Amino acid sequence: MLNEGIINKIYDSVVEVLGLKNAKYGEMILFSKNIKGIVFSLNKKNVNIIILNNYNELTQGEKCYCTNKIFEVPVGKQLIGRIINSRGETLDLLPEIKINEFSPIEKIAPGVMDRETVNEPLLTGIKSIDSMIPIGKGQRELIIGDRQTGKTTICIDTIINQKNKNIICVYVCIGQKISSLINIINKLKKFNCLEYTIIVASTASDSAAEQYIAPYTGSTISEYFRDKGQDCLIVYDDLTKHAWAYRQISLLLRRPPGREAYPGDVFYLHSRLLERSSKVNKFFVNKKSNILKAGSLTAFPIIETLEGDVTSFIPTNVISITDGQIFLDTNLFNSGIRPSINVGLSVSRVGGAAQYKIIKKLSGDIRIMLAQYRELEAFSKFSSDLDSETKNQLIIGEKITILMKQNIHDVYDIFELILILLIIKHDFFRLIPINQVEYFENKIINYLRKIKFKNQIEIDNKNLENCLNELISFFISNSIL
């Protein structure tokens, strides 16, 4: 009876087993018909196990066995371009992959001495983020907002922008509709993103247990690349549904409910996951894979709010764990400003150190100007008599807002972003009528792409700013408009 147990009770994706005296926390348990489970809690008289397959085939009184193995998932380069479930099994109809390397889903995060400061930028291709809320490799940046405000779109655009940048991307779908997942897969295929992307899918039709382990599976796969000295990006879409799945399992196990019926350790649920994302130094990578090179794992957790309430339990928890947040505003989204980023409430705590110097220099005032514009705009609704200075501020603020707007999946490279920031600083910007700003931007960006400017100069070239200023002056004087 030490390595053998009998099913006593079956709940929804959770079973209570008598026996299994030698079972360890996190151990894989084998049931009949090759059904697998993970030890979730150890009690004096019984063991609770979460089932990873179809639990409907289990019956009371059935036997189960210890495997003396911690639950592991396959890792490796062979997974790139594939769609897998939370157990590491392929879901696409492509040929079966042979992987010899496995890794446990639960791991301890790198220690203080294993880490390095965030000092390299991770470009999203989104103008407002790369200029005002910069993200560095190894950072954890929360994306928070109500449903249908473009949270997933920001992450997909970021994945699209990593093309030819030698960054592996992992997209973890937690509790989403299958139709939404298919839509995301089709977008990634359209932009050839599956060449460097792995999709870990646990949809709404999967059990709470599978949704619960999905982000840990994704994190383990990402850590494989980080520990090889590579840069990796992981998107958790979304951790609200992950917390719901954990709450469901905990309530089935009759654990005492706390605030909003979540169990007491829901903070640790997300902190142990997100702490695994970090920039590690070359000595840590050398210990893992004999490569003297630093690696990084950048995380984009997504949290869905209700009516813009960021003070509820899960949002406040994840805000306190992460290194900053991008707040998406429903009102901005409905007024046609997309991406609907609220610059006043969004912040990047460590990304500033990783930002290119030229962008840091040019974007310093823009954030303040936009925040002041939003305040003045609200104030101007109550006052008809405005002085000329306030009117000018409102006009410039509106023009900057238009310049920061972006079409879905239309990513901007670093040179295009610098050009936009230089246009804002240029005297000619004040002369452009509001209704011509978008037209002017499209024309000058198309011109920059046409002459293939990014192939002509390096980002760290001292003359870059002068070259782009000359290009703007040439563009204006030659009336290419």
From Swiss-Prot:
It is found in: Cell membrane. Keywords: ATP synthesis, ATP-binding, Cell membrane, CF(1), Hydrogen ion transport, Ion transport, Membrane, Nucleotide-binding, Translocase, Transport. It is a peripheral membrane protein. This is ATP synthase subunit alpha. One of its GO terms (molecular function) is ATP binding. Transmembrane segments: none annotated. Belongs to the ATPase alpha/beta chains family. InterPro entries: ATP_synth_asu-like_sf (IPR023366), ATP_synth_asu_C (IPR000793), ATP_synth_asu_C_sf (IPR038376), ATP_synth_F1_a_nt-bd_dom (IPR033732), ATP_synth_F1_asu (IPR005294), ATPase_a/bsu_AS (IPR020003), ATPase_F1/V1/A1_a/bsu_N_sf (IPR036121), ATPase_F1/V1/A1_a/bsu_nucl-bd (IPR000194). The gene is atpA. ATP binds at residues 145-152. Its main location: membrane. It is an enzyme of class 7 (translocase). Produces ATP from ADP in the presence of a proton gradient across the membrane. The alpha chain is a regulatory subunit. NCBIfam families: atpA (TIGR00962), PRK13343.1 (NF009884). The record marks 346 as: Required for activity. F-type ATPases have 2 components, CF(1) - the catalytic core - and CF(0) - the membrane proton channel. CF(1) has five subunits: alpha(3), beta(3), gamma(1), delta(1), epsilon(1). CF(0) has three main subunits: a(1), b(2) and c(9-12). The alpha and beta chains form an alternating ring which encloses part of the gamma chain. CF(1) is attached to CF(0) by a central stalk formed by the gamma and epsilon chains, while a peripheral stalk is formed by the delta and b chains. Its EC number is 7.1.2.2. It catalyses: ATP + H2O + 4 H(+)(in) = ADP + phosphate + 5 H(+)(out). Pfam families: ATP-synt_ab, ATP-synt_ab_C. GO terms for cellular component: plasma membrane; proton-transporting ATP synthase complex.
